[in-house]
C-alpha cells in the first residue's frame, strides 16, 4: 500500500498497523553488534540472569525504536516521505525480550505546510509499540517532511 500525501493526513487519525514482527535473538545480537554496543544487558544471558531484575537479555532499544517506526511505513509514508525532521519524547516504559511479537499504532497529531518547500508539508506523528500482551514497550513523537500531491 503506498504512503499518503500531506493533504491526505488528518489530525487525530490513528493507524493500527496490520504488520506485526516477532523479535529474535539474532535481531538483538545483530543490531547490538552493528552499532558497536557491547552492553551485557543485550548480549550476556548469564549476566542478566544473575544481575538484572529481568533475568534475561533485553532487546536493544534502538532496534525497538526502528522496528516501531518501520512497522508504520507501509500505511503512512511509503514513497511519500522526504525525510525525518526529528524525534522527541522517546520512551521505553517496558522491556522487549527475545520472542516478543510487536505491533504498532500511529496517531497524526499535527500537520502544517512547509514555508520553505512549497511541494512538501510537515506531519507530526506519535508512534506506539505494544507487545503480544498489549503492554506499551515504546513510544515517540516524530516529525516528517511529506510530499504534497502533485499538481494535476
What spans do the regions from the language model cover?
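HotDog/MaoC-like acyl-thioester-processing domains
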Residues: 1-11, 92-101, 105-152
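Hot-dog-fold acyl-thioester-processing enzymes
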Residues: 1-86, 151-152
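Conserved interaction-surface patches within small, structured recognition/assembly domains
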Residues: 88-90
Amino acid at each position: 500500500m503506498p504512503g499518503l500525501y500531506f493533504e491526505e493526513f488528518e489530525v487525530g487519525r490513528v493507524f493500527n498497523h496490520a504488520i506485526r514482527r516477532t523479535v529474535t535473538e539474532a535481531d538483538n545480537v545483530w543490531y547490538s553488534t552493528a552499532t558497536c554496543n557491547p552492553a551485557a544487558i543485550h548480549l550476556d544471558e548469564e549476566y542478566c540472569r544473575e544481575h538484572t531484575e529481568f533475568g534475561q537479555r533485553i532487546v536493544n532499544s534502538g532496534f525497538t525504536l526502528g522496528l516501531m517506526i518501520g512497522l508504520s511505513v507501509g500505511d503512512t509514508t511509503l514513497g511519500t516521505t522526504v525525510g525525518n525532521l526529528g524525534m522527541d519524547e522517546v520512551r521505553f516504559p517496558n522491556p522487549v525480550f527475545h520472542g516478543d511479537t510487536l505491533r504498532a499504532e500511529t496517531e497524526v497529531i499535527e500537520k502544517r505546510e512547509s514555508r520553505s518547500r512549497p511541494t512538501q508539508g510537515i506531519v507530526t506523528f506519535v508512534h506506539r509499540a505494544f507487545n503480544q500482551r498489549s503492554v506499551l514497550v515504546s513510544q515517540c513523537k516524530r516529525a516528517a517532511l511529506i510530499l504534497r500531491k502533485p499538481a494535476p
